[in-house]
């Protein structure tokens, strides 16, 4: 039983590590190197908590929702306007890779579309389906 539990734990650790590496590599396409190191972490954490991720990921997310939302909005507002669509697509792709197993894509799409309103930003007109992520 202990061997089975340690194998499951190792599998989850490997999945988390590969997902974070994928996010770090693809995020660098949209942001300068100084911003790429963890730029989307508060947004990703906010979306994961809002969409009701399981308790196994909650232990890694120690920040309150209000703080994560504020940090996410500050990051989104600091981006160039032409990056918003690409960033939303990147967020959607990351979310699909990491947490999509039990959640519907409509929930994620709705959340991504509400981000500009949540941050009091002018909504950006784009189709998430054109990203190949929905």
Swiss-Prot record:
Pfam families: Tryp_alpha_amyl
Annotated signal peptide: 1-24
SUPFAM superfamilies per record: Bifunctional inhibitor/lipid-transfer protein/seed storage 2S albumin (SSF47699)
GO cellular component, one term: aleurone grain
Compartments it resides in: Vacuole, Aleurone grain
Superkingdom of this protein's organism: Eukaryota
Entry keyword Flavoprotein: no
Region (Octapeptide unique to cereal prolamins): 69-76
UniProt protein name: 10 kDa prolamin
Taxonomic source organism: Oryza sativa subsp. indica
């Amino acid at each position: 039983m202990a061997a089975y539990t340690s194998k499951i734990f190792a599998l989850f650790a490997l999945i988390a590590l590969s997902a974070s590496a994928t996010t770090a590599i693809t995020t660098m396409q949209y942001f300068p190197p100084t911003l790429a190191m963890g730029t989307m972490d508060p947004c990703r954490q906010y979306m994961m908590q809002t969409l009701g991720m399981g308790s196994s990921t909650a232990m890694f997310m120690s920040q309150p929702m209000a703080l994560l939302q504020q940090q996410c909005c500050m990051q989104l507002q600091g981006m160039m306007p032409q990056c918003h669509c690409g960033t939303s697509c990147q967020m959607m792709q990351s979310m699909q890779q990491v947490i999509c197993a039990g959640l519907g894509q409509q929930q994620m799409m709705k959340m991504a579309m509400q981000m500009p309103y949540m941050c009091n930003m002018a909504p950006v007109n784009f189709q998430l389906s054109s990203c190949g992520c929905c």
